[in-house]
Amino acid sequence: MTQVSFSRRDAFVALSATATGGAFAAPAQAKAATQPTHHRTVSIDGIEIFYREAGPVDAPVLLLLHGFPSSSRMFRNLIPALSDRYRVIAPDYPGFGHSAVPDRASFKYGFARFAELIDKFLTELRIDRFALYVMDYGAPVGFRLALKRPGQVTALIAQNGNAYEEGLRDFWIPVKAYWADDTPSGRDKMRGGLTLEATRSQYLDGVADKSLVDPDSWLIDQMLIDRPGVSEIHLDLFKDYRTNVELYPQFHAFFRERKPPTLIAWGKNDFIFPPEGARAYLRDLPEAELSLIDSGHFALEDKGEEIAALIRDFLGRKLKR
C-alpha cells in the first residue's frame, strides 16, 4: 500500500484545516458549551482514515459525510455549532482530505468500497446508532451504509445530496455520456471537471453574496486534487457514480420502509443537484421537512448558520438522548 506525499502542501492544508473563523458562528446558547474539535486518524483495512470529532462521548452521534471535491473540512464551522448537544464525527474518504491515498493498483476506488470502509470505521469507534448528514458524494456513501445498518439510522439530513433521477439534470449530460464511453478520449473529456475554475464554480455558483465564501475552500480542494495520481482517482469515481443511480430503487425502499425522520436542507440554486432532487424525497418520505435555501451547492459556506439552526431544531425534536 502506497501513499502520495505532498510535503509542503501538507503543512499548508493542515494549517488551514485547523484555523478558526468562517462564514457563521454557533448559536449563542451553544457558544458557552462549545466542545473542542479533535483531529484523529484510525487504521481501517490498513488505510489511515482521518476524521474530525467533537462533543460528549455519550451524546447522540451525528455522522457527517462530505462531498466532492471537499473533505471533512467543509464541516469545520458546523461541527462546533452542534457539538454541545451531539457527538459529531466527520471522516475523510480515502483519496480525500487528510486520509491516506492508496495506489489505484492496490485499492479499488468506488462508492461501494467507501461505504464498506465507513461501516468498518463505525465498528472501530463502537458506534451502532447515528443520525446521518449527507452532502453530494456523502449521499450514495451514506445510503449504502444505511442499507447495511438499516436499524441504526436515527435521523437523516440531506443537504444537496441526491438520490433521485429528477436531481440529475443538465450538469449530468456529459457525465452520463462518460458512463457509456470507456475510451481514453471519453475519460479525457471529463478532466475539465477537475480544474480550478470548475472547483471554484462549485462554491460560488448560486451564491448571492460571494464574499461570504472562504476562497481557501476551493484552493485547498484544488491542491488536493492536483496531487500526483489523484485526478485519476476522481475520474474513476465519476465513472463509478453510475452504480449509485442503479441503487436508487433500493434507497427509496429504505426510505419508505424505515421512515427515518428526515430534514432536507437544500441550496436551491445548485446547478449540480437542482431542487427537483430535493422535492423528490417527499415522494418516499412525505413527512420529511423540506427547506429550500437561497444558496448553491456548498450551502454551508454562506448559509451555515441557517442550516445549523435548522439541524438543532430538527434533531432536538426527533432524537432522544
Segments the model singles out, each with a brief description of its role:
Residues K31-H38, G46-I49, A54-V57, V61, ...:
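Flexible "cap/lid" subdomain of the alpha/beta-hydrolase fold that forms the substrate-access gate
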Residues G21-P27:
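C-terminal segment of classical bacterial N-terminal signal peptides
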Residues N77-Y86, E124:
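A short, Lys/Arg-enriched amphipathic alpha-helix followed by its capping loop at the start of a domain
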Residues G67-S70, D136:
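Active-site glycine-rich loops that stabilize anionic/oxyanionic intermediates
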Residues P69-N77, V88:
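Serine-hydrolase catalytic-loop signature spanning alpha/beta hydrolases and amidase-signature enzymes
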